[in-house]
């Protein structure tokens, strides 16, 4: 878990560390990213949106862009339509038992979010009228 990562980072650093456990999950996650990214780095992120608000997902895009300028690369597993929207990203879809490169606007994450935003009033009405307390 990220809690364990933050704990180990404090143990390994040997210097007065950020007080990750005194911050929210998203704040501490973003702090670690900002502190630990270096030139020529290769970074693997697994669903970073789980820790980040929409605003911080946008901030992460800017951080990634700054890192890319320093020859860094990122491999990110995500369902976030925001993170998938990184300019010129190579997007690989693992849907339907095969791996294929896809265009941003053809991802299910983008299409689902666009449908929700375009038809928000419909979804609100449908939820209010048809939800019996179960999962949609």
Could you describe each region identified by the protein language model?
Residues 23-47, 55-67:
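GG-anchored amphipathic helix commonly corresponding to the ABC/SMC/Rad50 NBD signature/C-loop
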Residues 16, 45, 76-79:
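Preference for short coil/turn "hinge" residues that link or interrupt alpha-helices
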Residues 55-76, 80-136:
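C-terminal lobe/lid and adjacent interdomain/linker elements of RecA-like ASCE P-loop ATPase modules
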Residues 14, 26, 41, 85, ...:
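Residue-identity detector for glycine
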Residues 1-38:
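ABC-family P-loop ATPase nucleotide-binding domains
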């Amino acid at each position: 878990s990220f809690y364990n990562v933050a704990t180990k980072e404090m143990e390994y650093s040997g210097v007065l560390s950020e007080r990750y456990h005194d911050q929210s999950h998203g704040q501490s996650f973003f702090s670690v990213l900002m502190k630990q990214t270096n030139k020529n780095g290769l970074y693997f992120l697994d669903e970073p949106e789980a820790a980040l608000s929409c605003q911080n997902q946008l901030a992460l895009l800017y951080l990634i862009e700054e890192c890319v300028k320093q020859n860094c690369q990122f491999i990110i597993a995500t369902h976030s339509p925001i993170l998938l929207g990184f300019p010129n990203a190579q997007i690989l879809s693992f849907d339907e038992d095969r791996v294929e490169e896809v265009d941003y606007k053809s991802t299910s994450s983008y299409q689902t979010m666009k449908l929700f935003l375009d038809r928000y009033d419909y979804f609100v009405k449908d939820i209010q009228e048809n939800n019996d307390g179960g999962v949609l």
